[in-house]
């Protein structure tokens, strides 16, 4: 269902998901991370993508803000766009073996400040 929703939203907006440089994930370190990341890999990392999709989560920077999680993620992305820099994810050390996109390099967790959104 997530995959269909994302695909339809980007199609309706006229945006090719393969051109999106960064996606903010929920990333709570729970079982839900695997299906979320695998769905994002399928939608955003098609055969036409030439660079890894950069991913991150506000939770590594500030903990889980519970009901405000979506708003905090949106604020992080807006500030990153304004400052042309995505903050790194803390405490990431190795890829989840159940997320092929991390293992094969289609997804890349930002672990150093990343300059983008130019």
Region spans (language model):
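Condensing-enzyme catalytic core of the thiolase-fold
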Residues: 1-118
């Amino acid at each position: 269902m997530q995959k269909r929703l994302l695909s339809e939203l980007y199609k309706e907006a006229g945006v090719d998901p393969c051109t999106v440089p960064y996606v903010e994930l929920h990333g709570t370190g729970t079982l839900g991370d695997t299906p979320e990341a695998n769905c994002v890999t399928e939608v955003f990392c098609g055969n036409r993508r030439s660079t890894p999709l950069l991913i991150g989560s506000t939770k590594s920077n500030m903990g889980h803000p519970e009901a405000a999680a979506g708003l905090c993620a949106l604020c992080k992305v807006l500030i990153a766009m304004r400052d042309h820099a995505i903050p790194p994810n803390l405490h990431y050390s190795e890829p989840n073996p159940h997320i092929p996109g991390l293992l094969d390099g289609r997804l890349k967790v930002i672990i150093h400040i990343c300059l983008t959104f130019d």
